[in-house]
From Swiss-Prot:
Listed name of the protein: Transmembrane protein 131 homolog
Pfam family, one: Ig_TMEM131L_5
Localisation per UniProt entry: Membrane
Region described as PapD-L domain: spans on this chain: 55-228
Positions in the Lumenal compartment: 33-1049
Glycan attachment sites: N84, N114, N168, N235, N316, N317, N342, N372, N409, N462, N563, N890, N1013
Subunit: May interact (via PapD-L domain) with collagen proteins (via C-terminus); the interaction is direct and is involved in assembly and TRAPPIII ER-to-Golgi transport complex-dependent secretion of collagen.
Length: 1567
């Protein structure tokens, strides 16, 4: 058995039988069905003859008779009798809401097929109902006749339809259900089919006990309440399903509400059900109070759809009044009451009428009986001897209805003990009483007349339930008196003792006394009639007695008779539970005590109340000024001193003080035995303690809240909580705040008029009036005012505000300023209690001028503590600014404080000039003012007064004056009164400034600065102008001091001596620097440094080992192949040339190879004796000249790396060589050369480029090798860089030197003129340079930054592939640079289409080779061929000498090999570990060459792999067109070029010693 309302979702309905689904679909109503029907009627209709193929079984539906609220369903079968057409069933609709079909969607019926659908009949009214259901198909529209009859529901349930309400109306009608059975009716389930219709108990809850769901037999009981909120306009319908235990019956109640589109007045309870009413047993009028909700004052008037006598609408009380006595016969009322407002219906905003459904069943007649038979009154009137009480009585009832009356049951609503009353039922409980028939129903026997009782006889009939009163009472009234104040509290009246004396105490003489009240309360269950009343007083007393009337006693607060008239009504009898009140006031003219009498007569007694009083002269009153409760609010104990002023002539001894307010007030007398009030004076009696929380209890405006979200809501107005867009001006609960302020106002009004009763020995209890003032607690006790009337624009002003906790408990508070972004969108309507309304002219500013420097999280402030917070203000525009300081706390929820400030511009003028004015403050001196210096008076002073005026509203404080950078005085100017002063608003002051001339210049200009409290200092210009002739005259007349000449001579001597000492110190310092630098250079290369771990060093070692093996094999192959002869030839030729030509010298390093060749041709060495220098890539020098493979194009190394210690060579003066013009490669077609010139060329190249060995030694005795100093090895002695002085020296030498070149001897050949290039020359002298290890390295450019500034990475990286040339070693040619000209070239010449690769071995015969003959400069293939033809005879002559030298070289070959191995080891040990030449470069490469027996090992350029295979050789390019033998091709290779490391090589600009070497080179050039 469920114990609560089961409001199941829509899914619960679908789980029920098919009948529930049908009823839910029925919610569309007649209107929806009609629209649906019209929609389908618009479809294309089929020919009428197609309807003959349709057949409905049954062809007509008759549902019979069913009660209202019960649904009935029948099945209809549709047959498609067509042979080959498919029937499409679209919809089934009807005009009556009582019939509905369960058909959903569209359905197709195949030929000769059938389908079924259900038709539901749910009657909504009584009587027969007939209609035609329209069946829309593809064959046409068929009709199905349906009919049924609705009968009265035995449970008295009716549909709720036709109710109209405005938008946002909340409707809560109640549903009553009747139990027609002889046993209780148990309700199992109640739920709604629509989610908008919520169900709740009649009491408002959602759960209830089990007996709440049980309806007693023959009883009408409210079972459920529907709650509906109209959020959207339109029709809203649903079904309320009630499932009872009686045969598992389901009852359905249709509910339809129409929500109007506008807001207006409405009634929450739109169903007024009076039930069944008997005209004779009903009271005078039945009223149904409408719960009308209205947002403004309106006058309502109602009208019914039909005029019904006895049914009216009371607009003043918003009640529906049913007067059953006005109905002449039986009547069933099921009508709508339409209620309108007084606004015009023709206006656009006219209110919409709402409706109330009124139901009632009026039965003319009733069940009559003798009322005295059920009433036992045990007291007889006083002084009247009446008949004795009749204890046995008989109850006879009579049927006054026009229909027979069936009595089902008779019972007592309240049980009565059998010892008090004996009730006996006569006959069968079920009695049928015909119209106008009387039946004896009960017999009553009163056994105890001293015990009163009250109950009702409940008679259940087929018409209604009748309740007959059954009571026993005495009929006497309870009498009580109350002087001065009438207290109508129910508990006070019940506790009041029976009192027949009213003591008015001491009353003023000859003045009207205060009122006294006599209260007669009727505790009997029957009304008591007042027959008469009268007040009797003495002759010397004037009295006023008034019958106030009757009223109920259940009132929770004292009643003011003058102001509160609600609830009083005039009466002739006092109803049960009511009280009658008489008011008495007297005015006596007797000093003695006297009394009067009030008499009241009733049918059962005569009441006599004695009123006594005594006259006295004087009165007492409370001094309200001293009775001040400061800072009083709930949660705090308030206290004040009670002072009473007495006008009596005798003292009054206070016995005690009582308050009319029963709780919250307590009095403590200063004297434990009672204070005596002195006559005609003011006396402090005691102290009153007041606790406001005890008075307001649960309705206090200050309460302890535990809901943090209510105190500190994070999102205003229940927003979406989106951070960044929150308006912090609304971060408070506005609804809660207004509720609390309203509670505060109510409590303040209640406490504004209070009274206390003073009990004394001399006087009767006196009532004294006083009031208690409560406050709304404020955290900010005062309104902050800026310290100055205005604040300067741009100035930062800080104001301190103190927040104080006024309570004794800890306070959680949070404060923040209004967000300027929401200033224009914020509408504040805060109560006056939380915001100061005095600043009504303030508006929230939308500029960020106020700030809280120390704002943070909420703070817990202890009780009584204070917190000082700073608020800064700074504005950039002059204007008045206002903002709110929001303070949230758990005490008052919210408090707002207006902050206002005004920003203004300072207005200051000095000498009628604005600050920073261009015009100076002029001190102009005339000629006559200088007469004083001629007469002996040297002082020439002029004084001017300037006005400092503050024309603004900001007070300005002048702190001081600065002239220049000195205070008050500087360079002749002086402020006479330099003390600071203040300038108020529109205030001015004179400032005097004096100028005293010193006769040094005719114009003096200085700046005057005024130090102020503004955000800036005020500056002006001071200008003194004097006549020049007067100044000179006065300066000449000045007497010079005697020591001036001596001081001048002494200073001159000191200066000259200081200059000499500086020169001497510079010489010694230079020598010390040179010594220190030389020692540093020597110490740096003193020993090998521990190299860093570098994988390239490992590669070097492996390459050297492979080169050593290859070299040994190569020497053997040379001996076998007869190459010694050629080697001897080259050696002889080399020796011969070395004798005849000047000794070559090492030129300064230059990126211009042609310039280098010029320098190398200047002199020839006398003796070619050198220690072999092993390049880093070679493991050991070759014992004999060997053919070298072609090298791949990689980065060119411009200078060789210092890998060994070279031998110094004696150098003779060089010859000046004429610059050789550059020959563009590729301008002439390469000629086919024979093998002989190629061989000769290779021999010469090999002799020139290979490292000098012992077989190349001339017959002259060898000079012992001299080890060069360490500075030459690290490049410190090399000249690097390019300077104009060196260029001019080189040009001079080039003019004097004659260049002999065989390339110009050809017929018709004209040597092109080489243009001067821009060279990157680091200026090394021949004396300080160390020879490179390999001349071929000069052609190697390993990095683009080694070239001139015109060479980029693009030029280096562009290396297109050239045609491969097979040299016998399966090597491929490298790609040549496409557009990389000579370094330093100005690009004026045409770019040759074919240039050498980025990395290629230099030929020994090339003009830019270090070991080349000075007469040879091979630039193009034609030039090389012609030179070979000219030198061919010379090579033949030298061959014999080479053969003889070769024999000498064979003997020391082995010894030479060992020496080279040792040198190689030493070189590796001295190698710089940070060699950048080993770094990888992204230039074109493929693989390194494989070490092959019989060939020299070639070291690749930096960044290439060990298997690089792309090389390019100029000599190989020349012979690529013609055949060459294997030996000749092998000999055509040149010695391995030495790589240049741009950071560690001797001539590198990144070398550590470059700066020292550059300095030395410059010094050498100067020499």
């Amino acid at each position: 058995m469920p114990t609560q309302v089961q409001m199941r979702p829509l899914l619960r309905i679908f789980a029920e039988p098919i009948l529930l689904i049908l009823i839910f679909l029925f919610t569309l109503g007649a209107k929806g069905e009609k629209v649906l029907q019209e929609t389908f009627l618009g479809l294309q209709e089929a020919p009428i003859h197609d309807l003959g193929d349709l057949r409905l079984v049954p062809s007509r539906l008759d549902f019979g008779t069913w009660s209202v609220g019960q649904a009935r369903s029948q099945t209809v079968t549709l047959f498609n009798q067509h042979s080959n057409r498919t029937l499409q069933l679209n919809a089934v609709a009807g005009p009556s809401p009582a019939f509905y079909s369960s058909f959903l969607g569209t359905r197709e019926v195949p030929p000769q097929g059938n389908t079924t659908f259900n038709v539901v009949f749910l009657p909504r009214q009584l009587g027969a109902i007939a209609a035609d259901l329209l069946i829309h198909t593809s064959f046409g529209q068929a009709e199905l006749a349906v009919q049924g009859e609705g009968s009265e529901c035995p449970y008295r349930l009716k549909p709720l339809v036709g109710i109209k309400a405005p938008m946002n109306a909340t409707l809560t009608p109640e549903i009553h259900m009747y139990n027609p059975h002889e046993r209780p009716l148990q309700i199992l389930e109640i739920y709604s089919s629509g989610g908008e219709f919520q169900l709740e108990l009649p009491s408002g809850g959602s759960e209830g006990p089990q007996n709440l769901w049980k309806i007693p037999p023959h009883t009408l009981k409210p079972v459920i309440r529907i709650s509906f909120h109209g959020r959207t306009a339109g029709n809203h319908s649903a079904y309320i399903r009630i499932k009872v235990a009686e045969q598992e019956l389901d009852i359905f109640i249709p509910v339809e509400f129409e929500i109007l589109p506008r807001h207006s007045v409405y009634a929450r309870n739109p169903l007024a059900d009076f039930g069944r009413v008997a005209t004779l047993n009903a009271p005078d009028a039945l009223q149904f109070k409408l719960d009308v909700r209205n947002d403004e004052s309106r006058q309502l008037f109602g009208s019914y759809l039909r005029q019904i006598p006895g049914l009216s609408f009371d607009a003043n009380n918003t009640s529906i009044v049913l007067d059953a006595s006005l109905f002449e016969g039986d009547e069933i009322i099921n009508d709508l009451l339409v209620i309108n407002s007084n606004q015009s219906s023709t206006s656009p905003g006219a209110d919409q009428p709402f409706t109330v459904l009124v139901r009632a069943e009026i039965f003319h007649g009733g069940l009559t009986f003798d009322r005295n038979a059920t009433r036992f009154v045990t007291t007889s009137p006083e002084g009247v001897e009446g008949e004795p009480l009749e204890r046995k009585r008989s109850l006879v009832v009579r049927n006054k209805f026009a229909i027979p009356l069936m009595l089902f049951n008779v019972s007592l609503t309240e049980p009565i003990d059998e010892s008090i009353l004996e009730v006996t039922l006569v006959g069968d409980p079920r009695i049928l009483i015909q119209p106008d028939e009387s039946v004896e129903l009960l017999r009553l026997n009163l056994l105890n007349d001293q015990v009163p009782f009250k109950s009702f006889l409940r008679i259940e009939t087929n018409v209604t339930v009748f309740k007959l009163p059954l009571v026993s009472c005495s009929g006497r009234l309870h009498v009580s008196t109350q002087p001065i104040v009438l207290n109508f509290r129910q508990e006070s009246l019940e506790k009041a003792a029976y009192n027949l004396e009213l003591d008015l105490g001491t009353v003023p003489f000859a003045e009207m006394s205060r009122d006294g009240f006599v209260i007669l309360r009727n505790d009997n269950p029957v009304p008591v009639r007042i027959t008469n009343w009268f007040f009797k007083h003495p002759k010397t007393v004037y009295s006023q007695s008034t019958f106030l009337g009757c009223r109920a006693t259940a009132i929770g607060h004292p009643v003011s008779v003058e102001n509160d008239t609600k609830g009083w009504h005039l009466c002739t009898e006092i109803r049960a539970g009511e009280s009658a009140v008489f008011k008495v006031a007297i005015q006596t003219y007797e000093a003695d005590a006297t009394f009067g009498t009030l008499k009241v007569w009733t049918p059962y007694e005569v009441i006599r109340v004695r009123v006594k009083f005594e006259a006295s002269v004087g009165h007492l009153e409370i001094d309200q000024e001293q009775l001040s409760f400061k800072n009083c609010f709930p949660g705090k104990m308030c206290t004040a001193v009670l002072s009473i002023r007495s006008s009596f002539t005798h003292p009054v001894h206070v016995k005690g003080i009582s308050f009319a307010l029963p709780v919250g007030l307590r009095f403590k007398d200063f004297n434990a035995k009672g204070t005596t009030i002195a006559p005609q004076t003011l006396t402090k009696v005691g102290r009153i303690y007041f606790d406001p929380a005890s008075v307001c209890r649960n309705n206090c405006y200050i309460r302890e809240s535990t809901n943090d979200l209510a105190i500190f809501p994070s999102v205003p107005g229940g927003g979406n909580g989106n951070s960044g867009v929150i308006n912090n001006n609304l971060l408070y609960d506005g609804v809660e705040l207004r509720q609390r302020t309203e509670l505060f106002r109510q409590l303040r009004r209640q406490l504004s008029s209070m009274s206390l009763t003073l009990h004394s020995e001399e006087l009767p209890p006196l009532e004294l009036d006083f009031s208690i003032t409560i406050e709304w607690p404020k955290l900010v006790q005062f309104q902050p005012i800026p310290p100055t009337p205005a604040i300067e624009v741009g100035q930062v002003q800080r104001q301190w505000i103190t927040l104080t906790n006024p309570s004794q408990s800890p306070l959680l508070l949070d404060y923040f300023l209004s967000d300027p972004a929401f200033a224009r969108r914020t509408q504040l309507s805060l109560p006056h209690e939380v915001i100061d309304v005095s600043s009504t002219s303030c508006y929230l500013t939308d500029k960020e001028v106020f700030s809280l420097p120390e704002a943070g999280d909420p703070i817990l402030l202890p009780g009584g503590a204070s917190l000082t917070i700073p608020i800064t203000f700074s504005a950039q525009l002059p204007e008045k600014y206002c903002t709110l300081l929001h303070v949230r706390s758990n005490l008052t929820l919210y408090e707002a404080v207006w902050l206002q400030a005004r920003a203004v511009q300072s207005q200051f003028r000095f000498g009628n000039r604005r600050p920073g004015a261009a015009s100076p403050l002029l001190f102009e001196m005339a000629t006559n003012q200088f007469q004083g210096c001629q007469s002996g008076n040297e002082a020439v002073v002029v004084t001017r007064s300037f006005t400092a005026r503050n024309s603004g509203v900001i007070p300005i404080r002048i702190e001081g004056f600065l002239i220049g950078s000195l205070p008050c005085e500087d360079f002749g100017f002086k402020v006479m009164d330099c003390a600071g002063f203040d300038l108020g608003e529109n205030e001015a002051r004179k400032v005097e400034i004096a100028f005293s001339a010193d006769f040094t210049t005719s114009a003096v200009k200085r700046s005057l600065t005024l130090l102020t409290n503004l955000t800036y200092d005020i500056s002006y210009k001071l200008l003194a102008q004097m006549p020049a002739e007067s100044v000179e005259l006065c300066a000449s007349l000045l007497v010079r001091p005697g020591w001036e000449s001596s001081l001048k001579n002494a200073a001159l001597v000191v200066l000259l001596a200081s200059f000499g000492l500086v020169l001497v110190a510079a010489v010694f310092d230079a020598k010390a620097i040179m010594v220190q630098q030389n020692a540093y250079d020597a110490a740096r290369n003193k020993g090998p440094l521990q190299p860093t771990f570098n994988l390239r060093n490992i590669v070097k070692l492996q390459a050297e080992e492979a080169a050593a093996k290859a070299e040994s094999v190569q020497q053997q192959q040379k001996v076998k192949n007869g190459q010694l002869k050629e080697l001897r030839k080259r050696t002889v030729v080399n020796s011969t040339n070395s004798k005849s030509k000047s000794k070559s010298s090492w030129s300064p390093w230059s990126m211009d190879m042609n310039a280098l060749s010029k320098h190398l041709q200047k002199a020839k060495p006398k003796t070619v004796v050198s220690t072999p220098v092993t390049p880093p890539a070679a493991s050991a020098p070759a014992a004999a000249p060997v053919p070298l493979p072609e090298a791949k194009p990689v980065k060119k190394s411009s200078t060789p790396s210092p890998q060994g210690v070279p031998i110094s060579v004696q150098v003779r003066p060089q010859k000046k060589v004429k610059p050789t013009p550059a020959v563009v490669l590729g301008t002439t077609k390469p000629k086919q050369e024979v093998s002989t010139p190629v061989a000769d060329q290779h021999e010469k190249s090999l002799a020139k480029s290979s490292p000098p060995q012992q077989e190349n030694i001339s017959p002259k005795p060898n000079k012992p090798p001299e080890q060069r100093v360490l500075k030459e090895q690290n490049g410190s002695a090399k000249k690097m860089g390019k300077t104009p002085g060196r260029e001019r020296e080189r040009e001079r030498r080039s003019k004097d030197q004659k260049l002999t070149n065989g390339t110009g001897a050809g017929v018709g050949f004209r040597k092109p003129e080489r243009k001067q290039r821009q060279k990157l020359n680091f200026g090394q002298t021949t004396n300080s340079t160390s020879p490179p290890e390999s001349p071929d390295a000069l052609k190697c450019i390993s990095n683009p930054w080694e070239t001139s500034s015109r060479v980029s990475f693009r030029d280096v990286l562009r290396t297109p592939q050239m045609a491969p040339t097979d040299n016998g070693f399966d090597w491929n040619h490298a790609t040549s640079s496409s557009d990389l000209g000579p370094i330093g070239d100005n690009r004026k010449n045409a770019t040759p289409p074919m240039v050498t690769s980025l990395w290629e071995p230099l030929s020994a015969t090339a003009s830019n080779s270090l070991f080349a003959n000075t007469e040879v400069d091979f630039i193009t293939p034609d030039a090389i061929y012609e030179q070979r033809e000219r030198e061919k005879p010379q090579w033949e002559q030298r061959s014999d000498l080479v053969m003889r030298q070769q024999l000498l070289l064979q003997q020391p070959q082995k010894l030479e090999f060992q020496l080279r191995q040792q040198e190689k080891i030493s070189l590796l040990a001295n190698m710089d570990p940070s060699n950048w030449a080993t770094n990888w470069s992204p230039l074109g490469y493929s693989t390194w060459p494989n070490a092959t027996a019989g060939i020299g090992v070639m070291r690749p350029p930096p960044g290439l792999e060990q298997s690089a295979r792309q090389t390019h050789n100029l000599a190989q390019e020349q012979v690529s067109a013609g055949p060459a033998s294997g030996t000749g091709a092998a000999l055509h290779g040149e010695s391995l070029p030495t790589q240049y490391d741009p950071f560690t090589s001797p001539s590198s600009i990144w070398s550590d010693t470059w700066r020292q070497s550059s300095q030395r080179n410059n010094h050498n050039h100067m020499n």
